[in-house]
A protein has these predicted regions:
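Single, function-defining residue in the core of a domain
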Residues: 1-15, 108-109, 147-151, 155-514
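Short, Lys/Arg-enriched anionic-surface-contact patches
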Residues: 10-26
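A residue-level signal for conserved active-site and pocket-lining positions in enzyme catalytic cores
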Residues: 46, 136, 426
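Short, flexible loop/turn elements at secondary-structure junctions
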Residues: 64, 98-101, 140, 248-250, ...
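Active-site-proximal, Lys/Arg-enriched surface segment
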Residues: 66-184, 331
């Protein structure tokens, strides 16, 4: 089956996601336009790519700004085919969780704010304006041969920060209290302590509440709950365990204490985190004090790394293009105050792997990894492979921004700013799924040939999928016409490339004189 046919088949369930049939057809047409258009991926370029640049374009823009539809419904085809992509009937659903920033330059875009630039150097912090999103991608891999996993995005939730209200009275009061010399901290502190604090206005109280609700970790919890509901709604995935792999920013109390049912979290932890052992059953409590909840202090993750008494276990996992033996140390049933006394954890310390930049060079080592898991009895190969495969979501971010053009649309409506990037991520995810269902995980001869300077790739890249989709759309109308080449243009050029010159003036005068 062609990639175009499979992609069109996956778009058919979108009809139920939109209120009218013509709205669903318009969404499918824009999906093809956003994938096949060149340069910036704008709605106007998508309209031109579908050949409707001479028709009324207002309905295409109203699809994202006014039409009532749920962006989560666009990812339903991924969940419908998820059970067929897993290794077995008991295999867990592995999900990678991360946030990303889409840069914007407009000052009147709803939700755009200043944030830390991830491309800034480590010695100097830079700021940039952009839109924040929290993404979750399902990790699937081939079962018949060792190969890297493929991340299929299933959620792309906007996470705009709360807007701080402007209180003119508080600004004047603060300026009046600091009229003294700012270089005298004692005088300023005395003035600050001598006067009572100004009570918060209702707008400021609402801002503090929204600031907590719109934090990235809180949005991440909402994404996990939405994924669990989507899995429970299908008989093939309702009993499967949801295995979430996140980075250190999500390993905190907010996420660990609000995990949905049948959900396991794997995340990085500080090397100096204070852990505790389990409390013995018969433990005396000091008179007059509160009851103990934790046992003796356990070694920190860094101490576990350097402790030679703990056994070293080698786990077989696929990483960096081949199957490797990764050495780890484990410590089961430890407790962390951020997670609570009722949640036992599994500590996994991954020793740094040695590598050489060239043959015969000095042996270098990477940084160790300190992981915790909310399921102390989880299979170690599954745990470590899930953590290694989390890197695929970073590849999603790169392809979404550079090839799909997520958040490049020049829209200013609050709904369009949030739903247009979600629409683009949904069609990108369906394109990845269509390639797996049509051709499998390997890069076969069906794809367009690679240039001579590129090595053979194990799996097709996103650019390979876009080129193949464009070829299957635009090539059939040109099959009955001769394909032009550079030789055809060269044959049309005259034999004498130089223009014919007029005779010199001296020759002309001599001719006249003769």
């Amino acid at each position: 089956m062609l990639l175009l046919e499979k992609f069109h088949e996956l778009l058919q369930p979108w009809r139920s996601a939109f209120p009218q049939q013509r709205t669903g057809q318009r969404a499918q047409r824009l999906a093809y336009g956003l994938l096949t258009c060149l340069r910036t991926h704008l709605t106007s370029n998508a309209i031109c790519a579908t050949g409707r640049q001479f028709l009324d374009w207002s309905a295409d823009y109203r699809l994202f700004s006014r039409s009532p539809w749920d962006p989560h419904a666009l990812f339903d085809p991924i969940f419908d085919h998820l059970a067929d992509l897993l290794a077995s009937a008991q295999a867990p659903v592995v999900v990678a969780l991360d946030d990303t920033l889409c840069k914007k330059t407009g000052r009147h875009i709803p939700g755009a704010t200043f944030a830390r630039d991830p491309q800034s150097p480590p010695f100097h912090l830079n700021l940039c304006r952009g839109l924040r999103f929290v993404q979750a991608s399902v990790l699937v891999r081939a079962t018949r041969f060792p190969a890297p996993a493929r991340a299929l995005p299933v959620r792309f939730e906007p996470a705009p920060p709360a807007v701080k209200p402007k209180n003119q009275n508080r600004t004047r009061h603060h300026a009046r209290n600091n009229q003294g010399n700012p270089r005298n901290p004692k005088k300023t502190a005395a003035k600050r302590n001598s006067k009572t604090t100004t009570p918060l206005t209702p707008e400021e109280q609402q801002y503090r509440l929204q600031k907590k609700l719109r934090a990235l970790t809180q949005v991440g919890v909402g994404v996990l709950q939405s994924l669990r509901q989507a899995l429970d709604a299908r008989p093939a995935t309702c009993q499967r365990q949801l295995l979430v792999s996140g980075d250190g920013s999500y390993t905190n109390r907010t996420v660990l204490r609000q995990l949905p049912q049948r959900t396991t979290f794997i995340g990085r932890i500080r090397k100096d985190a204070k852990l505790f052992q389990a409390l013995p059953p018969a433990t005396a409590t000091r008179s007059g004090g509160r009851p103990r909840r934790y046992g003796a202090v356990a070694p920190t993750p860094e101490q576990v790394l350097h402790d030679d008494a703990l056994p070293l276990v080698k786990i077989r996992c696929f990483a960096a293009g081949e199957v490797r033996q990764i050495p780890v140390k484990i410590l089961r049933h430890v407790y962390w105050r951020k997670a609570g006394a009722d949640l036992p954890l599994l500590l996994v310390v991954v020793k740094p792997l040695g590598y050489r930049l060239r043959k015969g060079s000095k042996l270098l080592y990477r940084q160790p990894a300190f992981l915790i898991c909310t399921d102390p009895e989880l299979d170690l190969p599954t745990l470590l492979q899930s953590y290694i495969d989390r890197w695929e979501i970073e590849c999603n971010h790169r392809d979404e921004k550079s090839l799909i053009g997520v958040a490049q649309g020049q829209v200013w409506n609050s709904q369009a700013v949030a739903r247009l990037p979600q629409f683009q991520v949904a069609i990108y995810s369906l394109l990845l799924l269509a390639s797996i269902l049509a051709y499998g995980f390997k890069r076969t001869a069906t794809y367009l040939p690679l240039p001579l300077w590129r090595r053979k790739s194990i799996r097709p890249s996103t650019l390979d999928l876009l080129n193949l989709l464009r070829d299957q759309i635009f090539a059939p109308p040109m099959q009955h016409k001769p394909t032009p080449s550079i030789d055809d243009f060269a044959a049309l050029a005259p034999v004498d490339a130089n223009a014919t010159k007029l005779p010199l003036a001296s020759e002309t005068l001599c001719t006249i004189a003769a």
